Amino acid sequence: MADPQATNGTGAVCAERDASDVGDVSDVGDARDEGAGRVVAVRGAVVDVAFDGGALPALNEALTIPVDGAAPILAEVHAHLSDAAVRALALGPTGGLRRGAAVRATGGPIRVPVGDAVLGRLLSVTGAPGDDGAALAADVERRPIHRGAPLLAEQKSANALFATGIKVIDLLAPLAQGGKAAMFGGAGVGKTVFVMELIHAMVERYRGISVFAGIGERSREGHEMLLDMRGSGVLGRTVLVYGQMNEPPGARWRVPLTALAIAEYFRDERAQNVLLLMDNVFRFVQAGAEVSGLLGRLPSRVGYQPTLASEVAALQERIASVEGAAVTAIEAVYVPADDFTDPAVTAIAAHVDSMVVLSRAMAAEGMYPAIDPVASSSILLDPLVVGEAHVEVAIEVRRVIEHYRELQDVIALLGIDELGADDRRLVGRARRLQRFLTQPFAVTEAFTGQAGASVEIADTIAGCRAILRGDCDDWRESSLYMVGTLDDARRKEAAAREADARREAAAAASGAGPGTTSDPASGSAEPQGARHGR
């Protein structure tokens, strides 16, 4: 029999294991009770358990393993190795676990608390409170984390707009109420801030329930989000479910299912709209790859698990709306090395209605939210859904910005003055559109000192139409930067002109003469890196 603690020489657990590697079934001793077993091998997060007598626990059934001086370890069955042994994945640290430890099958899958008792709470993958609040009542209702998607006849199509108040989203990549949207971006481009702003929008606009699944993210970010939600007053209608990056892969892999079980309860039993936010779905795939390796499966492309497509589909298909209640999913997706052809990214993208692409170049220029207006898209951008006027403005905005990008190499080499009059005019309007599509967020008020702005779709369309028409050609670009509506920009422009007039008057009175004011076409306060030659 192979050494139960054998490794591959690098500290990683050997993947080549079979039923003969489980350990001697006689180690079970006298544990002949129904559902009772003994640990016969421990390899990191993988625990092999032998049962003597009675039926084996079913796949996905939960097992509890008492540990001296610590909370019991919860594990989940993932393979039947023989007629008397199973392989389980521990959802917590296995330190202190030893061969021969007693194991008890629970008779069903992991069950987590649901209902009003979990609102405003931070939970682990098993539903245990992770905040400084009181323990949950023993009689709180619980639901299994494993469940099928609603029947097709029960599902409702997502064709109603989910207005976010974020201009670039509502105009160019509108979200569906009851649909799925994903934000794709590399590290440090603002995915988490964007998720928090959407939670704020849900609470303010729809008075619904928000369920946030933190999958494999930093503990510091999770703590900051908890404090921010408390400070902003949105925590009372939000449930936070965390599986941090320091936790075993099994916990990170099952966190989305725990969040889904809670969201499904409010959808089915309370008929309430739910905003389900997941940050980060790539970490779910990553945890699945770790689990696959621990269970001895051969990897597929780029080291991902061979079941990548089916695992992503099983998760995404459960996110569904029914008559009377909608589950709207917003998913942050990390793009490794900014490679949008990565198998994990393409597998997730196949299931979403709206794709929001966050651009590192936009972030470098200070254009926040750093959403690429050309690469982002939505199936809802259709005249039958949003109307002809909306689609016409969105198409023209994309065309103008895309043409400006095509001219940027020429501008960098020769300068903007070498362009024709029409192209110079288009470049000016494209730059003003880019700045108008920025806006301050409510969740960043404490850092920027600028009040957040939520803009109606009609105001966004009217503002973009005015810029495309040339109504703002003589405005400073800085007047359109980080504002809400065009009226806000108009007031900002008027204030800047008044300030220039006062400076000119003061300069004339002192004899210095005019000529020290900023260029009214470009403004003096534009974001770093936003000059024409960039």
From Swiss-Prot:
<dbReference type="InterPro" id="IPR020003">
    <property type="entry name" value="ATPase_a/bsu_AS"/>
</dbReference>
<dbReference type="Pfam" id="PF22919">
    <property type="entry name" value="ATP-synt_VA_C"/>
</dbReference>
<keyword id="KW-1003">Cell membrane</keyword>
<comment type="function">
    <text>Produces ATP from ADP in the presence of a proton gradient across the membrane. The catalytic sites are hosted primarily by the beta subunits.</text>
</comment>
<keyword id="KW-0813">Transport</keyword>
<dbReference type="Pfam" id="PF00006">
    <property type="entry name" value="ATP-synt_ab"/>
</dbReference>
<dbReference type="InterPro" id="IPR004100">
    <property type="entry name" value="ATPase_F1/V1/A1_a/bsu_N"/>
</dbReference>
<feature type="binding site">
    <location>
        <begin position="185"/>
        <end position="192"/>
    </location>
    <ligand>
        <name>ATP</name>
    </ligand>
</feature>
<dbReference type="InterPro" id="IPR055190">
    <property type="entry name" value="ATP-synt_VA_C"/>
</dbReference>
<dbReference type="InterPro" id="IPR024034">
    <property type="entry name" value="ATPase_F1/V1_b/a_C"/>
</dbReference>
<protein>
    <recommendedName>
        <fullName>ATP synthase subunit beta 2</fullName>
        <ecNumber>7.1.2.2</ecNumber>
    </recommendedName>
</protein>
<dbReference type="GO" id="GO:0045259">
    <property type="term" value="C:proton-transporting ATP synthase complex"/>
</dbReference>
<feature type="region of interest" description="Disordered">
    <location>
        <begin position="494"/>
        <end position="534"/>
    </location>
</feature>
<comment type="similarity">
    <text>Belongs to the ATPase alpha/beta chains family.</text>
</comment>
<comment type="subunit">
    <text>F-type ATPases have 2 components, CF(1) - the catalytic core - and CF(0) - the membrane proton channel. CF(1) has five subunits: alpha(3), beta(3), gamma(1), delta(1), epsilon(1). CF(0) has three main subunits: a(1), b(2) and c(9-12). The alpha and beta chains form an alternating ring which encloses part of the gamma chain. CF(1) is attached to CF(0) by a central stalk formed by the gamma and epsilon chains, while a peripheral stalk is formed by the delta and b chains.</text>
</comment>
<dbReference type="InterPro" id="IPR050053">
    <property type="entry name" value="ATPase_alpha/beta_chains"/>
</dbReference>
<keyword id="KW-1278">Translocase</keyword>
<keyword id="KW-0997">Cell inner membrane</keyword>
<dbReference type="InterPro" id="IPR027417">
    <property type="entry name" value="P-loop_NTPase"/>
</dbReference>
<dbReference type="InterPro" id="IPR005722">
    <property type="entry name" value="ATP_synth_F1_bsu"/>
</dbReference>
<dbReference type="GO" id="GO:0046933">
    <property type="term" value="F:proton-transporting ATP synthase activity, rotational mechanism"/>
</dbReference>
<dbReference type="InterPro" id="IPR003593">
    <property type="entry name" value="AAA+_ATPase"/>
</dbReference>
<keyword id="KW-0472">Membrane</keyword>
<dbReference type="InterPro" id="IPR000194">
    <property type="entry name" value="ATPase_F1/V1/A1_a/bsu_nucl-bd"/>
</dbReference>
<keyword id="KW-0375">Hydrogen ion transport</keyword>
<keyword id="KW-0547">Nucleotide-binding</keyword>
<keyword id="KW-0066">ATP synthesis</keyword>
<feature type="compositionally biased region" description="Basic and acidic residues">
    <location>
        <begin position="494"/>
        <end position="505"/>
    </location>
</feature>
<keyword id="KW-0139">CF(1)</keyword>
<dbReference type="Pfam" id="PF02874">
    <property type="entry name" value="ATP-synt_ab_N"/>
</dbReference>
<keyword id="KW-0406">Ion transport</keyword>
<dbReference type="GO" id="GO:0005886">
    <property type="term" value="C:plasma membrane"/>
</dbReference>
<dbReference type="GO" id="GO:0005524">
    <property type="term" value="F:ATP binding"/>
</dbReference>
<dbReference type="InterPro" id="IPR036121">
    <property type="entry name" value="ATPase_F1/V1/A1_a/bsu_N_sf"/>
</dbReference>
<keyword id="KW-0067">ATP-binding</keyword>
<dbReference type="GO" id="GO:0016887">
    <property type="term" value="F:ATP hydrolysis activity"/>
</dbReference>
